[in-house]
Amino acid sequence: MSTSISTTATPSTPGERAWALFQVLKSKELIPEGYVEQLTQLMAHDWSPENGARVVAKAWVDPQFRALLLKDGTAACAQFGYTGPQGEYIVALEDTPGVKNVIVCSLCSCTNWPVLGLPPEWYKGFEFRARLVREGRTVLRELGTELPSDTVIKVWDTSAESRYLVLPQRPEGSEHMSEEQLQQLVTKDVLIGVALPRVG
């Protein structure tokens, strides 16, 4: 007896698989109404490195806020409304003249979404995740950041308990700049710790 059932797998795109999974979960009422739309809004518009730039610039000009940020990063970011998934346990890492902090997620690609936005592609790559821990200075140099030989590089591995944000040193030449202008110096790479804020 012949059969018309094919034993050859039909390839599907990740988008098609995600849509099929979504439909199954929705049909079983396992996804709250509006959840996906809300998450899409957060990812597309609300989670952004500009949020982190506002936090850093505020810390540069406001000593009380800086102290709060270093004591309780979650509470400090919440003052701006930067909360939500991956932002429950925010820890600010303060750069000093002798210490440069860098963030990595050695197991996957977790970041502090509400303040850093979604991770860049290179951050998710195995090479970056594996090499940064072993040869941080070399990796930073390859990414365009040259540090003095006596600077200690501290690599912080993101976990379920901690989501990090680098608080860089305020750059020389920025003394005359307003808080809004200072925000423009802080990029996603600066917040991750692989770049330095620069004036001009």
Swiss-Prot record:
Keywords: Iron, Lyase, Metal-binding, Oxidation
Regulation affecting activity: Inactivated by oxidation of Cys-110 to a sulfenic acid.
Annotated GO MF terms: nitrile hydratase activity; transition metal ion binding
SUPFAM superfamilies (UniProt xref): Nitrile hydratase alpha chain
Entry comment on modification after translation: Oxidation on Cys-108 is essential for the activity. Oxidation on Cys-110 stabilizes the Fe-NO ligand coordinated in the inactive form.
Enzyme class: lyase
Source organism (scientific name): Pseudomonas chlororaphis (Pseudomonas aureofaciens)
Cross-referenced InterPro entries: CN_Hdrase_a/SCN_Hdrase_g_sf (IPR036648), CN_Hdrtase_a/SCN_Hdrlase_g (IPR004232), CN_Hdrtase_asu/SCN_Hdrlase_gsu (IPR023900), Nitrile_hydratase_asu (IPR018141)
Residues recorded as bearing Cysteine sulfinic acid (-SO2H) in the entry: 108
Name of the protein in question: Nitrile hydratase subunit alpha
Function: NHase catalyzes the hydration of various nitrile compounds to the corresponding amides. Industrial production of acrylamide is now being developed using some of the enzymes of this class.
EC code: 4.2.1.84
Cofactor binding note: Binds 1 Fe(3+) ion per subunit.
Binding site for Fe(3+): 105, 108-110
Subunit: Heterodimer of an alpha and a beta chain.
Reactions catalysed according to its record: an aliphatic primary amide = an aliphatic nitrile + H2O
Pfam families per the UniProt record, alphabetical: NHase_alpha
Transmembrane regions: none
